[in-house]
Amino acid sequence: MAKTELAVAELIWNMIARKTGNVGKVDFFPQKPAFPFGEGFPGREEAEQPLERAIPETQGISSARIAAFLKDLALHESIDIHQIMLVRNGKVICECGFAPYPAGMWHASYSMCKSITGMAIGMLIAEGKLKLGDKVIDVFHTRKNLFNIFRLKDVTVENLLDMTSCVSFNETGIVSGNDWVRGYLESGLAGVPGRDFEYNSMNTYMLSAMITEITGESLMEYLRPRLWEPMGIRRIFWETCPKGITKGGWGLFICPEDAAKLGMLY
């Protein structure tokens, strides 16, 4: 059993035994800043490049149908909607916030942000700094040893993107310590890389770590001149791991309009 698996097993056992004092193995510190509301945000109008607004009917959509849709959402007890924005032909035809959430503030994007990490990897490939067939262990060459060279010899960048790495170290394992890259590279495999699908957010985290390893910049810093600034995306926040690496697969807070801009790219 790998060190990470042993650490997780120990943590679970201590919780069962009610030995919870100093049980954590990960250094925690608050990260998320207060959301920058209002007109006072520096350069907001000039930098954020808001999408054009339009009356629904001018884009072939009935306002009455949209109003009925919003009412159904508000009355549906099993749906906890925070905000909704409808974009048609590149124009915003509806935006709504459901109490107590005001329209226009950021929200956790969960796994939607994996697509943004994928964009960054595509940019890195376009710049000639990475290839889909590159081996993960070669990117992190300073961490090579006899064990992980053998175990991870077939795991490629493409396997991380399409969730076929088969690496066992997943989100559960991050409670075992601060160095998540080490935990991933020391992990075993639960299948055949490139053949077996296993959804694992740590694959996307490792893509983010690759960007830092190759460029010396965090994923957030790397995307700033390539994506955030050109698209006017300013009010955004992405959590980092204890080592300062952007999480990549989760932890992104983004405004609905900015998420819509990214969706329009495809």
Residue ranges and their predicted role:
Residues 110, 197-199:
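Catalytic tyrosine of NAD(P)H-dependent dehydrogenase/reductases that use a Tyr as the general acid/base
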Residues 203-210, 250-266:
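Active-site-proximal alpha-helical segments within enzyme catalytic domains
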Residues 90, 108-133, 160, 207-211, ...:
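Active-site SXXK
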